[in-house]
Each structure stands twice: as structure tokens, then as C-alpha cells.
């Protein structure tokens, strides 16, 4: 008792902790891996570097070394962790040189444990897990700024000046119980010596349980995770992570201001004269009476779940060079990627392996694959303007055409993907919201779907159901790939470097093929121009296709995996590694590819300016950038360092299929503007002429009569006839030479056409019908479509082809 009164109380030695410290020290010094190397000895030598303070221990190595030691650490982790850190500190000092020991003596070191077998769901974290080592998984929804935390404090007594060192701080400011000087009776008046105290990096992260762990009808739960040392700033909002650590219980400091505590404090101080100023009252009574506790997760190791080749996720991999990534791969991975890159049918094989449950729609699947690969992001030399490399894709079509299925498949496959619905999402939910922090009461930015999908894919279903004001909010994110916020005193520009995969339904439920795309979807022109690819999925009645789709669906319901084995040439993990490796390539555009790009863009512009074209929406310079991005993605797909002509042609073909996919109505060639000697009458009105027929002159009476229905041709027939006439005129021009060519007479052109189809003309009426159709098609090409030009006007004009006219799919 005299020892307790006169000086410090005697501390009880933790024998179990000391035993763990000794055994863990032996493990660090003597453990050898499969290559018979002391891996942890070399790791301890690296701790001398100023930025290193954590050693990473594989739990399987601990079990292999001593099952008893590993079990003790797993069951009593929070109790023995300080002893493990002390063992690491002493072992590191032994491994250091004399010059390095002084530097390492005051350094705070940490032990990070990973590769724990059992995984606990966030919902299962309860009081029985407190203090034990557990592994949880979740998605990061918020990260707080990194700030210094007082780890070991050094206090100076204000009465006698004696210094008390190494006072451990447990999540709150903790002073010594009494002065270290036995003659000094001070218990409260201490000042902190900042220079002699130890501070460490501290960050709080909030994770949310994943959808796979979510029970039916439940709301996702969140838990606060505390990370220190090298673990800070290793993850970002949106990452799916595996976290190893322990569940701890900490006092809820925010509850100190509850009415019950204020009343208690005022009763204690009532009638007591004191001039001591206090900040937060009630700190001495932490854990007493109506103060509540809250749970938090103290992490010792955190890493992204979807780690790819080289140990990084897709967003980080793209920043590295492909040669560096290749050097980090295992021999098995190298062989697999080499085999895939040499595959001549890699497009089809990867597409079939990615979407085994979706039948057909090869172009759609290829477009989604190119979106996952992406183009090369660039910055202009002079202005420094950023040019996005991500590809945006929109799927428009009838119900039950597997649009949402494609989105779900991408969400499951992509390492960083967010799935959301347009109708259930607001502008703030898609971009970012400003909310008040529950502890600091300051306004902080809460990441939205596009921020969470940074360096990934944001899948937006029911895109057409979004309100117009919400669509406007993502204009900036889709083109500049940033989100600007100015609200509640917070002004920030945030990154949203995500590809957008959207699905939309037509206006009236079914796609009207007789109308252009812009009239079939409820989207503004600025939004439509920001999509690189538009795919129209029409539910057509086709016996062969319907049978194949029905067979595929029934196979899925009957749990028959034959189609999966047949279609899946590659494993999903291999495809992930291949895409991550391919994204490291930054292909350059060759001179021939640049010429092809210009030529294909001019084709698109000419088709858009032509009234007879089947363009879905306005072709702008953004479509040229889309061509560049798609060409780069195709080059990446083949792991190419250069964009070739075939890549550009394939990209142009894909863009054409997504743009020019509108059926035009039949064309009626029965206008009254034509001046010819053929009288067009309707069959049901022939007998109603009566006395009116007496008014016609001799020429008109002798003119042949043609049924109006026979002068109605489909748009496809019209295009075929116009292309035949244009090709004939251009061949004449090539044969005669540009200098000698004067054009073709209309009558000669009609006669040539009739001579080519002479074998199909059986009656005089057929001859008159085809002649009239040809003349009226020529008239439309001159006056309406402006494909042909009149060199000489008159009853029989001389014609030539417009020099800028380009035949589609020539």
C-alpha cells in the first residue's frame, strides 16, 4: 500500500501478451517462405525509410509457423496488438545499423495482417466480435481528410516540471493519473510537450455493405473504419474493399451535449466557486450514466477486392506502362495474355464469354467491350484542354430486348461500376451532394454515382425517364468529365472520369422505325451528341431468332450450363486481366489512319446533309472524336501500339450501324409537278371521268393511263435506283475524263436504265410504269435531294453528279 501511496501503482504484467511478443519476434526473425528466404527480415530493413512504418504479415504464414500463436492473435487481437508492435520495434532495432537506430528509436511501427480465411458480414458485427481479428468487405461511400492523431503523449507537470513519457492515447485525450514525481501531488495540471510526443496519420472511412450480402427487403448498413499509418489514402469512394481488423467500442462524444449530462454537470458545480474554465463538460464521466457508445472498426489492413494483374485495380493500372505491368506478372498470366492477344477471333470470343446468357446483338456487345477498353485521354499542348478517352454508350429499344441484362452484366464484371436508375436518381444523387457532417457539423461533399464510378462505368437504367433538370446536371460530367459544385459555401471541381452506359425505352413503348431516333427517345440534342454509340434494339418477329432466344432462356431456367461452356472461350478473371493490360497501351494514330478518319467523317457529314439520308441525329465534330476513341479502343483490344486503317474502318462500320438504322417510309412518285405525257389516274376513279374526259386535247386523250399505286416504291428501292444511276454517270465520267465530260442527257439516262431491265418488262404498261418511275426519281434527285445537277436546263436537261455526293456503304 505504501508503494501505491508514495509513487506510481505497480502494473500487472500480461503474461500472455509477453509470450505473444516473444513468439512473434521469433517469427519475424526466423520464418522462411517457399523460396527459403527470410522475407520478413528484408521487410524490416525497409522500415528504415521515412515513408515506411508498416510491415505486412500473411496470416497463413503465422498459422504455418505456430498454430497456437495465430489462434491467440485471432481471438485476442486488440489485447496483444501492442505487444506485436513492440516485438516489431525491437526486432527492427536489432536489424538496423548504429546510425539508423537513433532514427528508429522514436518511430511508431505497425503490423498489418492480411489473408484471413473467414469473412464476416457487416450486418453480423456484434458485441461478441469486439477485440477479435475479423475480415469484412464493403464499398467505400465516404472518406474523411487525413489528420494527425496523438499516439504517445509526453506531458510536463506544471507544478514540479517532471516529464511523463509514453502516455498511450485511446481515441481521446488522456492525461497521466498523477505526476511521476513521488513528492508532487499534482493530478490534473499537465501540459503537452508536442515536440516529444508521437503523432501518426489518422483517417476515418465509411463503408457500406455490398448488394451481395444484403438480405431481402433490408437497407444497407454502414460502419466507420479507422485506418492509420500507411493505410491512409489507399482507397477512394466507390472502391470495393476487403478490410482486416477488429471491432472496437468507443464513447460517442457527440452525446456529451445531451440534456441529461448538462443537468448533471450543473448540479455538481452548483454553489461551487471556481474560476477554472472548462471546454466540454462531463469528460471525466465518460462511460457513465446516460452516455452512449458506438461501434467502429479499427483496420490494420485494407485493399481493393477487385485487384488485377500487378495488384492494382483498373483505374490505377491505366496510369502505368504496359512493360512495367508485364514485368510484375506471373509466368502463367503472361502465357494466358500472350495466347489471347494472338487470337484472331478475339473480338467474338471475348464478347461471347462476357455475355453468355444474352443471345445475338454482336454489335451491341462489341460496343460495350470497346467502352470497357476506352480510348486514350489526352491534353492539348497549347491550351491544356482535356480530351476524354472514355466511351459513352446508349441502348434504345423495345421492352424485353436485354438492355438491363447488359447493364447488369457490366456491373458484375467491371471492377468499379455503379448501377442506378434514372427515375429514382436526382441530380445530386448522380453528381455530388453537400451534407452536414454529424461530428464536425461542417459541410462536406457526399459522392454521387458518377463520382463513385470514377475510372469505371456508371450504368444508368431508364435514362429517358430522368427529369430534364437531372439530365442537364450530367452534361459536364459526360464531356469534360468533371463535376462543379457551388453550394452551401462549398466550391469544388471533382473528377468524374467514368464511362456512361445508359438504357432507354422508346417514347410510345415500341420503336417506330419510320421515324428518326431523335423522335423515338425523350432526350435532348446535347445529351444525344455526347453519346459515342447509339444502339437500337428492335423486337422483330423472326422464327429462327425467336426459337434460339427461347432455347437460351429455357436453358438458363433449367440450369443447363451447356451454352456457357460452349460460348465461354475465356474465363472472366482472364478477361479482366487482359482488359487491364490492354488499357495500359496508348496507341498513336498513323498517317494512313488519320486520312481514313477524315474520309469517314466526311462521309458521315455528307450523309447528314443529304435529305435522303437515314441519319438518326445531327452529325457533329463529336462524332469525329468518337471515331478516334473507338479506333483507339480497337487498337487496345489487339494490344497494338498504333491505330491502323482496319481499326478505323471497323470503328466507322460500328458507328454507321449505330447511327444509320432508321427505316424510311415508302416514297410516292405521284406529284403533279411533273411535265410529261403520261396521265396518272386512280383505278377506282377511272369510271368517274364522265364529261371531263372530253375536255382533254388529242395528246392527253392518247396518253397512257397508269395506276397511282404502281408509282409507290419503298425507300430501299428508291436508294437502289438512285445508286445505279449515279454509278453509271460516274463510270461515264471516268471513261471520258473530267476535262472532256459534259454530262448525260436525261433521256439518254432513262433509255440506258430501261435497256438494263428490258428482260423484266413483259407488257407495254410495265414499260410505261418503269419509265415514269425513272423520270420521277431523277426529278427528285435534282430538285429535292440535290444529288444531281443540271448543267444545261430545258425539256431534256444535261445532268451530272454533285461532286461531294457519297454513296452510303460504297
UniProtKB/Swiss-Prot annotation:
E.C. code: 3.6.4.12
Residues bound to ATP: 397-404
Similarity section: Belongs to the MCM family.
SMART domains, alphabetized: MCM
Keyword line: ATP-binding, Cell cycle, DNA replication, DNA-binding, Helicase, Hydrolase, Nucleotide-binding, Nucleus
Gene Ontology MF, one: ATP binding
Cellular component per GO, a single term: MCM complex
Catalytic activity: ATP + H2O = ADP + phosphate + H(+)
Domain MCM: start-end pairs: 346-554
Gene that encodes the chain: mcm-6
Species this protein is from: Caenorhabditis elegans
GO biological process, one term: mitotic DNA replication
SUPFAM superfamilies listed in its UniProt record: Nucleic acid-binding proteins, P-loop containing nucleoside triphosphate hydrolases
InterPro entries cross-referenced by the UniProt entry: MCM (IPR031327), MCM6 (IPR008049), Mcm6_C (IPR041024), MCM_CS (IPR018525), MCM_dom (IPR001208), MCM_lid (IPR041562), MCM_N (IPR027925), MCM_OB (IPR033762)
Motif segment (Arginine finger): 529-532
Miscellaneous remark of the record: Early fractionation of eukaryotic MCM proteins yielded a variety of dimeric, trimeric and tetrameric complexes with unclear biological significance. Specifically a MCM467 subcomplex is shown to have in vitro helicase activity which is inhibited by the MCM2 subunit. The MCM2-7 hexamer is the proposed physiological active complex.
Subcellular location(s) per record: Nucleus
Classification of source organism: Eukaryota, Metazoa, Ecdysozoa, Nematoda, Chromadorea
This protein's name: DNA replication licensing factor mcm-6
Subunit structure: Component of the mcm2-7 complex. The complex forms a toroidal hexameric ring with the proposed subunit order mcm2-mcm6-mcm4-mcm7-mcm3-mcm5 (By simililarity).
Signal peptide positions (record): none
Protein's job: Acts as a component of the mcm2-7 complex (mcm complex) which is the putative replicative helicase essential for 'once per cell cycle' DNA replication initiation and elongation in eukaryotic cells. The active ATPase sites in the mcm2-7 ring are formed through the interaction surfaces of two neighboring subunits such that a critical structure of a conserved arginine finger motif is provided in trans relative to the ATP-binding site of the Walker A box of the adjacent subunit. The six ATPase active sites, however, are likely to contribute differentially to the complex helicase activity.
